Structures are given as structure tokens and as C-alpha cells.
Amino acid sequence: MYSWKSKFKFGKSKEEKEAKHSGFFHSSKKEEQQNNQATAGEHDASITRSSLDRKGTINPSNSSVVPVRVSYDASSSTSTVRDSNGGNSENTNSSQNLDETANIGSTGTPNDATSSSGMMTIKVYNGDDFILPFPITSSEQILNKLLASGVPPPHKEISKEVDALIAQLSRVQIKNQGPADEDLISSESAAKFIPSTIMLPGSSTLNPLLYFTIEFDNTVATIEAEYGTIAKPGFNKISTFDVTRKLPYLKIDVFARIPSILLPSKTWQQEMGLQDEKLQTIFDKINSNQDIHLDSFHLPINLSFDSAASIRLYNHHWITLDNGLGKINISIDYKPSRNKPLSIDDFDLLKVIGKGSFGKVMQVRKKDTQKVYALKAIRKSYIVSKSEVTHTLAERTVLARVDCPFIVPLKFSFQSPEKLYFVLAFINGGELFYHLQKEGRFDLSRARFYTAELLCALDNLHKLDVVYRDLKPENILLDYQGHIALCDFGLCKLNMKDDDKTDTFCGTPEYLAPELLLGLGYTKAVDWWTLGVLLYEMLTGLPPYYDEDVPKMYKKILQEPLVFPDGFDRDAKDLLIGLLSRDPTRRLGYNGADEIRNHPFFSQLSWKRLLMKGYIPPYKPAVSNSMDTSNFDEEFTREKPIDSVVDEYLSESVQKQFGGWTYVGNEQLGSSMVQGRSIR
């Protein structure tokens, strides 16, 4: 468990920051650096950093309101559907070309971005032909007990179902497999004798051994099997998604929780694992009680139309997964919304996950779709008093425009006479900084994976003429599967063309680029410097020019040579030399992100596959489900979630500054002022 308190220091007064968050700095209090004037802090005897051992972010002004660094993830809300008469319609499989079917652009957007928002309802009926990628034990005693704990289909007696399966088991062909010549049930037959859901003795709780996730716009629903076997699971579930961006596909991932007692002997696992690295990874996860990823699929959806009526996109459609390990029967309906204004009353408040002088952040559930989000409430009077209206509106603008799977998306924004509200995807895998602190450093493949996803996120911002300016592990979240989610856009600079320069002194001391320290003005290339610093820190545990004394650290950034530990990867070293060039015009990425993409360090990556989240992340955060709040400080989560009443009058001229705040999936809605009611 780690503290998230430091994430909520932004937007607080200077006195609050010093009193409550002095631990965020190195041992002693460090003043924020302004206008290129650095003040020396006291030394700490230890150079090992913790989550409280970090230089503070340098804001453009003392009163900057920077978005709260919250962890969000997707909801897994589903309801039961009993319309399970799955008819056979056309089958979709991995041979379909998504580029042709769904009109995927380089950023994953559909061609028509102007159609209205709405709700997409997915009905999941059943699965078929699922197999496991490995054989299992042939022990009848183990399999009989497992079958007896399984859940039968509706209206069928469990004893008859178990007897039928046990009878089949007695006739199944046992094969001598592997170097150990072990008697095993083949992978093709194994799934027929493992229940998809079990009920432990003395318990009425269902424990699914097979489930899959449906992801749309960083919101995730978890669909768990209710009955049947892994080969033929029954689901009968409904899940509804809010559609605010017309993305061209759904991402489906299938997972299994296989009891380790079903695996072949340790000797067999070791010998076969030496021959097949992927198989060894599967065995390692099962033996560590982790879920294994079986298969995936990207289902094309066409939401680019103008219609006020509900439309069925798929009707009892069979989806064959990419690797052919099974298929799923679904229907999908889309219903355009009426673009009615939202209010806080449209959400159930679940938990407080952060607080500050600006207001609070809560985990909420949208009442109509039952999807879980993070809602950030900001008091208007606070940001007016801090002269931060422009920055806050800019933050909302960036969040509404970004279109990248590795950036936390804005789902909605709305306002009342007293407050502004952000509704964002809820991502709960924790800060990258926490995971880096816990492990010290990452291996090469893990660091490469995170760097590649961040490269896509920064490139997406640059294409929108936005400079991020504050890349660091604290501003990077992991979703429940382990993908990157970039957050905190309070220091972004908008309307920055390729050759434009700005000279605002802001960022985080360890990550400041030389041109920023010299006050020469900087371009988008400043983000590639910070990407290099982050990659170096992930591989070594510390930023390249780190020093306890801030002025000394700045001097190192400007003058000291880049040093690498012994045995450092050659391609990683060459990439870092390019990214950490002190001359921004010679820095890798100065002429565009493709310069970085084409570097040998990423030669084994398919960028198209990466953008579609087609790679299995190297690490999956330890969260029980997509609503898990264990990565948030209990000081917040224990508090009763309420939207506190604010009795603060703001004049009409002040209220007009917040015009255009509302976002429900398009930018056509203006801002209507209705006293005492929710404001659009």
C-alpha cells in the first residue's frame, strides 16, 4: 500500500503544500523554482528515492491548478440477460481487415467524428469450442472433484451433468506427452472437463474460471461465465457503454483461472518450458495463482451515422478469436442520446479517492449505464481566486481532443453554479512511480513496452499542437491490465506548431531539458528529452543527472556527460544518446516521432498492433477487479462520498468565463446559465 496524498497537493495554497507535503521533497523543504532561479536544498544522506522523495513540480505560477493525479480504471458492471437463443449468423474472425472494415486511422479514430453520442448495449450469450494451450493431468480423482463443484446450465440437475461428464472422462484418450512421457489429457480435450464456473463447498459464491473483458474507449466491462465448461461456457450478460467518441472497434480479451493442481508435473513443466518460452510464462502465472490470457479479438463497429433510432450492429453474431482458441456469441445495439445536460444527480457516489483545496475526486457510477468513472469536482471560486480559469479550461480542452488509447480520456464535463465537474475513465493499477519504486528498476522489455506506449501518447498530443511538459512516473498510471494511461494535463501548452517556441519555466527538476534551464525557449522536442530521462530512470532506477542539490543537478544537466552502467543494452544506449541530446535541433524526434519509432530499439514492435493494445503487458497490477480502490489512500476511501454544498455567489460576468465547459461527446453544446440548476 502506498500513499496517494502527494498526488493531491496541486491546486493547494503554498502554505498547505509546505505544511502537508514537505515529505514530497528530499528530506528538507525545497522551494519551487521560478523564473530560472534555483535555491539549494539540504542534503539527504540517502540517494534511494521513495514515493515521498521527489522534487516538486515547478508550476508556471504559485497558484497553478494542475489536474489531480488520480488512478482510474474501467468498470465491470454487467447485468443478466436471459435471451440466450443464440442463432447462427455470420461469423467474424481474425482474417477480417480492420483497416477496411472499420476505417482505422493512424490514431484509431473513425472517419466521421461528428455524429452524436449515445449508448452501446452488448448482450453476451454463450461461447463454444474453447480449448487450452496446454494439456492437463489425467487424474480422475482431481477432475471428478472439480466437475462436482461446477455450475450446470439453467434447469438442469448438476448430478446428471456431472455423471455425463465423468462418463465422457472415462472414455477420453490419454496420451503420453512430453519428454517425461507423462499420461495427460490433450489440450483439445482438457477444456471439456473443467467447469467454467465453480461453487466451493459450503459457499453460494460463484468463482468463474473463465471470463473475458470488453474494452471501449478505456472503459472495461468484465463478463464472467455463469455455467457450463470452459469448452462451452454460458454467460447471459448485458453490459452498456457510454459512447462519447466514435471509435471503430471493441477489444475483447479472454482470461482463465486454472487451478495449479491441474497442471502436469513440475518436471514436465520445466522440460517443456525450456522448449516454449510462452508456455513457461503460462505455467509461471498459474503456479503464482495469476490469471492467464487465452486469446483476444478486435471487433469492428461502425458508429459513424446520423440516426435518432436504435440500430442493431450485430445480431447473435459468432466471433472467432484471433488464435482460434474459442468463439463467443453476442449482439450489439446502439442508441443515440438526446444530448441532455448532465448533473451530479446522474451519478451514484461510491468512494472518495482524493481531496484538496480545489475540491475532491470520487469514484462514481453513472446511473443509466452502470459504468464506473472518476469524477473530479472543482470549486469555481477557488480557481477564480487563483486566476486559473484559463488553465482549467485548457485542461478540459486537451482532455476532450485527445484520441489515444494510452491517455486517460475525458468522458463528460458539466457544471453547476458553484462547481466544475470532470468525468474521466477510472484507472486503478497505480502510478508507474510506485511500481518503479517497489522494483527498483525494470527489465529491458518492460521499459521498452512502457516507452513505446508513451511515445504514442506524446505523438498524439503533438499532432494536436499540444506540448505535455511534465512527463514523469508520477503522471503515468497503469490500467488494470498493465497498459499505460497518461494523466495530469495541467502544465500542457496549447497551440504549439512544430517550429513554435515558448519560454515558460515549468516542469519537474529532474526532468528539465537544457534549453528550458537556459531560458532560450523550447519546442515540442522538450517532451522527447523527458521521454529519454524516463527511459533512463526505468532502466537504472534514477534519472541520468540526479543530485540531491537542485542547482548542482541543473549544472549536471547542462554540462556532465551521459554515463551508462556496465552491460547496458547497446540499442537502448544509442536511443538515449539521441533523446538526451542537449541541442534540441539534433535531438531524436525533433523532426517527428517517426524518427524514434524507426530506431532499432523498437525494431521488433508492430506499431499498429501496439496502438490496438494487441500486446500483452509485461506486468499486470494486483487489483481484484476493475473497481478495486486498494491503490488509493484509506484516509480518502474511508470518508463518506458526498457532493458538499458550496454557498458561494459568483457574478454573471464570472460565470461567463466558464462558457463552453460542457462535454458529452461532441463540441456542439454551448453553455446555458440556469441559476440553481445544473449548467450546460
UniProtKB/Swiss-Prot annotation:
SUPFAM superfamilies registered for this protein in UniProt: Protein kinase-like (PK-like)
Biased composition (Basic residues): 1-11
Membrane topology listed for this record: Peripheral membrane protein
Modified residues (Phosphothreonine): T57, T502, T504, T662
Function recorded in the entry: Plays an essential role in the proliferation of yeast cells. Involved in a signaling pathway, required for optimal cell wall integrity, that acts in parallel with the PKC1-SLT2-dependent pathway. Downstream kinase in the sphingolipid-mediated signaling pathway. Phosphorylation is regulated by the intracellular sphingolipid concentration. Disruption or inhibition of sphingolipid synthesis leads to the activation and phosphorylation of YPK1 through the TORC2 and PKH1 pathways, which in turn phosphorylates ORM1 and LAG1 to activate sphingolipid synthesis.
Reaction(s) catalysed (UniProt annotation): L-seryl-[protein] + ATP = O-phospho-L-seryl-[protein] + ADP + H(+); L-threonyl-[protein] + ATP = O-phospho-L-threonyl-[protein] + ADP + H(+)
Gene3D superfamilies: Phosphorylase Kinase, domain 1, Transferase(Phosphotransferase) domain 1
PANTHER family listed in its UniProt record: RIBOSOMAL PROTEIN S6 KINASE (PTHR24351)
Region (Disordered): 1-117
Name the UniProt record assigns to this protein: Serine/threonine-protein kinase YPK1
Ranges for domain AGC-kinase C-terminal: 603-673
Subcellular location: Cytoplasm; Cell membrane
Residue sites binding ATP per the record: I353, G354, K355, G356, S357, F358, G359, K360, V361, K376
Lineage: Eukaryota, Fungi, Dikarya, Ascomycota, Saccharomycotina
Biased composition (Low complexity): 59-71, 84-97
InterPro entries per UniProt: AGC-kinase_C (IPR000961), Kinase-like_dom_sf (IPR011009), Pkinase_C (IPR017892), Prot_kinase_dom (IPR000719), Protein_kinase_ATP_BS (IPR017441), Ser/Thr_kinase_AS (IPR008271)
